């Protein structure tokens, strides 16, 4: 998956507008530019699906991630470790929060959440869907990996949906190592988090 489109696209457009402002300010006080507007534009060019070109570009930037799940002797998750490449972290604290939020969201997807539908309509109330409560969330170690990124947006790739992608596989593999049972559907069955189906 890609990083945050807004961080990359809007960030580069903003950087370009700021470069124009900086150029206009050369040797002048800011008050001389009162009322002047500066614009920046950035279009991230990608190739269409099925393009007959060598090495087609489907995303402008990619983020990479790895996650680890630690299951205790009682079968409950003790800790999640999530390392995510963000290029340059514009706001490291926000990146950590995004990682933690994605992990919690995907933990629910992997272990407890069930959204039953009948004829495309929900058959359960929101409060019964199995969302994790704050006191049920294990320790989450969020690792923001900064590495040189693109030459746009000051190297920021951003972070988005990728925070929730590796979580369920990490949890499934942790349970496989725990009890030797391969689980291939979500929510995972036969864990301390499993709910009795009605």
Question: What are these model-derived regions, one by one?
Answer:
Residues 1-198:
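C-terminal catalytic domains of large/alpha subunits in multi-subunit enzymes
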């Amino acid at each position: 998956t890609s990083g945050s489109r807004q961080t990359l696209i809007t960030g580069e457009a903003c950087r370009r507008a700021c470069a124009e402002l900086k150029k206009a300010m050369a040797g002048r006080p800011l008050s001389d530019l009162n009322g002047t507007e500066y614009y920046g534009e950035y279009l991230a060019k990608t190739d269409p699906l099925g393009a007959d070109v060598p090495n087609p570009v489907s995303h402008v930037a990619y983020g990479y991630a790895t996650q680890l799940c630690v299951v205790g002797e009682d079968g409950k998750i003790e800790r999640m470790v999530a390392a995510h490449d963000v290029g340059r972290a514009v706001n490291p604290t926000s990146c950590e929060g995004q990682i933690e939020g994605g992990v919690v969201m995907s933990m629910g997807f992997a272990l407890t959440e069930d959204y039953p539908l009948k004829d495309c309509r929900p058959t359960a109330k929101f409060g019964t869907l199995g969302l994790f409560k704050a006191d049920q969330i294990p320790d989450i170690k969020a690792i923001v990996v900064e590495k040189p990124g693109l030459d746009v947006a000051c190297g920021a790739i951003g972070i988005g949906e990728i925070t929730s992608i590796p979580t369920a596989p990490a949890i499934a593999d942790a349970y496989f190592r725990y009890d030797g049972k391969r689980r291939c559907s979500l929510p995972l069955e036969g864990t301390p988090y499993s709910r009795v189906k009605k």
